[in-house]
From Swiss-Prot:
<keyword id="KW-0441">Lipid A biosynthesis</keyword>
<feature type="active site" description="Proton donor">
    <location>
        <position position="266"/>
    </location>
</feature>
<dbReference type="InterPro" id="IPR011334">
    <property type="entry name" value="UDP-acyl_GlcNac_deAcase_C"/>
</dbReference>
<feature type="binding site">
    <location>
        <position position="243"/>
    </location>
    <ligand>
        <name>Zn(2+)</name>
    </ligand>
</feature>
<comment type="function">
    <text>Catalyzes the hydrolysis of UDP-3-O-myristoyl-N-acetylglucosamine to form UDP-3-O-myristoylglucosamine and acetate, the committed step in lipid A biosynthesis.</text>
</comment>
<keyword id="KW-0443">Lipid metabolism</keyword>
<keyword id="KW-0479">Metal-binding</keyword>
<comment type="similarity">
    <text>Belongs to the LpxC family.</text>
</comment>
<dbReference type="GO" id="GO:0016020">
    <property type="term" value="C:membrane"/>
</dbReference>
<dbReference type="Pfam" id="PF03331">
    <property type="entry name" value="LpxC"/>
</dbReference>
<dbReference type="InterPro" id="IPR015870">
    <property type="entry name" value="UDP-acyl_N-AcGlcN_deAcase_N"/>
</dbReference>
<keyword id="KW-0444">Lipid biosynthesis</keyword>
<dbReference type="GO" id="GO:0046872">
    <property type="term" value="F:metal ion binding"/>
</dbReference>
<feature type="binding site">
    <location>
        <position position="239"/>
    </location>
    <ligand>
        <name>Zn(2+)</name>
    </ligand>
</feature>
<dbReference type="GO" id="GO:0009245">
    <property type="term" value="P:lipid A biosynthetic process"/>
</dbReference>
<comment type="pathway">
    <text>Glycolipid biosynthesis; lipid IV(A) biosynthesis; lipid IV(A) from (3R)-3-hydroxytetradecanoyl-[acyl-carrier-protein] and UDP-N-acetyl-alpha-D-glucosamine: step 2/6.</text>
</comment>
<dbReference type="InterPro" id="IPR004463">
    <property type="entry name" value="UDP-acyl_GlcNac_deAcase"/>
</dbReference>
Amino acid sequence: MLQRTLAKSIGVTGVGLHSGERVALTLHPAPENSGISFRRTDLDGEMGEQIKLNPYLINDTRLSSTIVTDKGLRVGTIEHIMSALSAYGIDNALIELNAPEIPIMDGSSLPFIYLLQDAGVVDQKAQKRFLKILKPVEIKEAGKWVRFTPYDGFKVTLTIEFDHPVFNRSPPTFEIDFAGKSYIGEIARARTFGFMHEVEMMRAHNLGLGGNLNNAIVIGDTDVLNPEGLRYPDEFVRHKILDAIGDLYIVGHPIVGAFEGYKSGHAVNNALLRAVLADETAYEWVEFADSDDLPDAFHELNIRNCG
């Protein structure tokens, strides 16, 4: 299977979830083996240079997965666009933006999916590299855990737990094996969510200024405040899977393995990536030059053409 990039550059404007400021974002094609990179067009000099993404650049996970370089450059809320790039198997792309965070759009990855469909996807000459999990690796932290286990494909299983009546009406666990299920159909539409009392507290600290009922599920004392309700009966846990897929794709390659999590979040997801990369016996890099050898979970990537 070959590496791929965008067929053409494409842009979109939106609002930053935390800043509330308008953000112009452009995705560009990039050369093979260059990976996913970001560039802040609103900054000059070294701060305006291109940054190649890797798990060690995620140094702020309090509210999202945020790049923070040693020079203090920030690019926040990257998980939704990374999730969409993962769904289309984009290996190489340059993402330019004129603000410190990716626009929130509608709170899901679906607008970025549409953007990729409009841009189109092209194969490149180099073989796509996969990160294959060879043994179980687990991170436990303050009542939550995540783990990788070997698996001939890509499967994600997550469980959430919140002490709130809304969550008692929603299944807490969701599992998706991409050998038989579609990311676009099952995951892409799931929106980020938050509690009304948290929104008020965040705004008091100049955070969440761009959040509203058009780009997040807002939960009141007893119910969801969005008049249209939920897009899936279990939209909450599906969004956590959307986030996890984006967080894991920060490694820059598709993962051959199973990911499980209980009350997972950006911090433990990133810690798990780092733990795998720190143990050379836990993984290997593989290629599938013969499509017959490609695990079923990636067959949809092999035939999908956005153009």
